[in-house]
């Protein structure tokens, strides 16, 4: 039996129940555990309360309860430079970014991992719902978490083999109710704490108000694809492909009473295109182009892959053929897909294994580019 006490694991602790139980399990398994709270954003709310301060109090309470040392480290500059600037640049380009994917790649498994190594860590661990399996030759495979509704491999798809080699996901074999039960049984102060939702630096704030603090809104015309003027939009950055709510045109009808959806954008003319019907023709595509394509283990420079893919979180897998060349890929769908959104992640799977992914640049309908940016 191996002596885990000689293995140091540094746990990223957010003050939530998942990372609390992660630290608890590793401590119970005999590892040398250190808890680290990452302050990535100055998130004082409208009442003057810094939610990070409240979260850190929870980390301190849990660390004291389970008997591990803890530290707080400030990654605000790294987060601003590597995640938030990217987030703003994507919106300026008419795309819809996924900051969680970039945060995992650049902060939790780069800045944090690097910091953990200075503390003598053998591994880092987080409360993500994913699994890592190690081959005899040392190769690490990332598998979906067993809790289908909580699986977070979509957000971890940009991690490298080197990052995964140093990573543990102790919750990957558990379902969320089991995690809460373990926290309650151990009397952890975070056992009943509500899960955080949404983009970490926006939290409960109004998204439009938040974004307008950093990017000037540029109102423009809202049009149907056949040229009918539907009024004014508030700024292209506030809308995403396939969006239904927030258009302000619910009472206007075309040929039928079907609801209206965002079906396209023209950044150069500042036009937002809308159409009626969930499966409007303009929302459907047959392939996409992706860049920043990356796999969790070594792959040839150029190859073709038959696998499944997700184009957004919690979406069922779809069969695809992927033609990879360097860090770019053409992804051809077995069945047409709805609302493929530039800026979002496309993530590839082989059964339970997450193979990697990329960022969507363009969607195509029978070889013609969709007007999504």
Swiss-Prot record:
Annotated residues for binding of ATP: 12-19, 38, 127
InterPro entries linked: MnmA-like (IPR004506), MnmA-like_C (IPR046885), MnmA-like_central (IPR046884), MnmA-like_central_sf (IPR023382), Rossmann-like_a/b/a_fold (IPR014729)
Coiled coil: none
Protein location: Cytoplasm
Listed EC numbers: 2.8.1.13
One Gene Ontology MF term: tRNA binding
Catalytic reaction annotation: S-sulfanyl-L-cysteinyl-[protein] + uridine(34) in tRNA + AH2 + ATP = 2-thiouridine(34) in tRNA + L-cysteinyl-[protein] + A + AMP + diphosphate + H(+)
Pfam families for the chain: tRNA_Me_trans, tRNA_Me_trans_C, tRNA_Me_trans_M
Active-site feature positions: 103, 200
Renumbered residue ranges of the record's region Interaction with tRNA: 150-152, 312-313
Uppermost EC category: transferase
Gene Ontology cellular component list: cytoplasm
Disulfide bonding pattern of the chain: 103-200
Region described as Interaction with target base in tRNA: 98-100
Keywords for the protein's UniProt record, in alphabetical order: ATP-binding, Cytoplasm, Disulfide bond, Nucleotide-binding, RNA-binding, Transferase, tRNA processing, tRNA-binding
Transferase keyword on record: yes
BP GO annotations: tRNA wobble position uridine thiolation
Site feature: Interaction with tRNA: 128, 344
Gene3D superfamilies recorded: Adenine nucleotide alpha hydrolases-like domains (2.30.30.280), HUPs (3.40.50.620), Translation factors (2.40.30.10)
Top-rank taxon: Bacteria
Function, as annotated: Catalyzes the 2-thiolation of uridine at the wobble position (U34) of tRNA, leading to the formation of s(2)U34.
Family: Belongs to the MnmA/TRMU family.
NCBIfam families found in the cross-reference section: PRK00143.1, trmU
Protein name: tRNA-specific 2-thiouridylase MnmA
Gene: mnmA
């Amino acid at each position: 039996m191996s002596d885990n006490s000689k293995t140091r694991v540094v746990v990223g602790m957010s003050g939530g129940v998942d990372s609390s139980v992660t630290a608890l399990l590793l401590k119970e398994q005999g590892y040398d555990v250190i808890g680290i709270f990452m302050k990535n954003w100055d998130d004082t709310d409208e009442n003057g309360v810094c939610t990070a301060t409240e979260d850190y109090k929870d980390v301190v309470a849990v660390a004291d309860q389970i008997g591990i040392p803890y530290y707080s480290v400030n990654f605000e500059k790294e987060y601003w430079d590597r995640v938030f600037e990217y987030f703003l640049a994507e919106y300026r380009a008419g795309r819809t970014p996924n900051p969680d994917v970039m945060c995992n790649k650049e902060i939790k498994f780069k800045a944090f991992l690097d910091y953990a190594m200075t503390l003598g860590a053998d591994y880092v661990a987080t409360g993500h719902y994913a699994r890592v399996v190690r081959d005899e030759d040392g190769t690490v495979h990332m598998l979906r978490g067993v809790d289908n509704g909580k699986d977070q491999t979509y957000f971890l798809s940009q991690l490298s083999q080197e990052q995964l080699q140093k990573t543990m996901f102790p919750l990957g074999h558990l379902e969320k109710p089991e995690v809460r039960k373990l926290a309650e049984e151990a009397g952890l102060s975070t056992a009943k704490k509500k899960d955080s939702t949404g983009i970490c630096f926006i939290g409960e704030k109004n998204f439009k108000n938040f974004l307008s603090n950093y990017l000037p809104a540029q109102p423009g015309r809202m049009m149907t694809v056949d040229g009918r003027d539907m009024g004014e939009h508030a700024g292209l950055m506030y809308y995403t492909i396939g969006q239904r709510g927030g258009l302000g045109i619910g009472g206007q009808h075309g040929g039928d009473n079907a609801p209206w959806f965002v079906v396209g954008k023209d950044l150069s003319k500042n036009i937002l295109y809308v159409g009626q019907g969930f499966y409007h023709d303009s929302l459907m595509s047959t392939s996409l182009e992706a860049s920043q394509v990356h796999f969790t283990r070594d792959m040839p420079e150029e190859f073709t892959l038959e696998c499944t893919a997700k184009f957004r979180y919690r979406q069922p897998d779809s069969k695809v053929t992927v033609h990879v060349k360097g860090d770019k890929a053409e992804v051809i769908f077995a069945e047409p897909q709805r609302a493929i959104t530039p800026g979002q992640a496309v993530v590839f799977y082989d059964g339970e294994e997450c193979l990697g992914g990329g960022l969507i640049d363009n969607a195509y309908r029978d070889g013609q580019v969709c007007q999504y940016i």
